[in-house]
Amino acid sequence: MNTRIPTAIAAVLLVLAVAANAYDKQLDTHVIHEAYILGQRNDKSTGDFLANYLSQITEPQNDIHIAQIELLTPYAQIVDVSRQKSADGYKEDQAIQDYKTHGNTVKVNVSLMLPSAYPKSAESKEVPTPAPATGPEKSAIRPENFWQNFQFNLKQNGKTIPSRGISNQPIHSTATNTAPAVLTGENVWLEYDVKDVASELTNVEVVTPQGKVIKATFDLKKLR
């Protein structure tokens, strides 16, 4: 019996160690409350937390720019939604209901920005900008489905994880008295089942139409 007790304790410690190095896949009401409050604060602590789930892409790119890649665990999703709706009277009961509705998922967001919306270098600023196109010519420049020419992959240990769904949200400029709103980019969302996403190094790869691979790496052992 004396030899079995240490073995049992070691087994418990091992389970605790694994749990401590794994993102939260299933959230109870206590954890949802914690995430909700962090989002509602919408302060530096909220920003510092969510910064771990975002990768700004600084690698030089031609044409369409992959501006940033975001990976959100179930916990981070609640924080992010609560933050976005902190001024809209978003209630904790709604956060709980939203979690039950959307289930346990890992979400990836890729922001694609058109060249006209991306900051220009000093050299490019010296080149005269062509006059804006109008009519049929304008609509032919960049259709809203341009993002479909890109490939999006979530990989662990070199293996591609199948997505459960993909959606997009166009990004438009703000209309003014002298200029209408125009398409400036696209947010592409991919959804994955937490059962398929392990707590380990995870790569989000975006393949451009020209075959260039842009990658962001997240260590899910260090995320909630």
Write out the residue ranges for each language-model feature:
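Bacterial N-terminal signal peptides that target proteins for export
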Residues: M1-I9
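Conserved functional micro-motifs across diverse proteins
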Residues: A22-R224
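N-terminal signal peptide c-region/cleavage motif recognized by signal peptidases
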Residues: A17-A19
